[in-house]
């Protein structure tokens, strides 16, 4: 994820990793942000 205004937090809706806040990635199957291991 990226540090930008409006980034999505854990379990926030997303389409791609860049929609999520830092250390989060978009889980394609559920279309929500989750911890990416960083």
Swiss-Prot record:
The keyword Disulfide bond applies. Signal peptide: none annotated. It is found in: Secreted. This is Mu/omega-theraphotoxin-Mb1a. Expressed by the venom gland. The record marks 37-38 as: Responsible for the inhibition of BgNaV1 fast inactivation. The presence of a 'disulfide through disulfide knot' structurally defines this protein as a knottin. Belongs to the neurotoxin 10 (Hwtx-1) family. 28 (Jztx-11) subfamily. It comes from the Eukaryota.
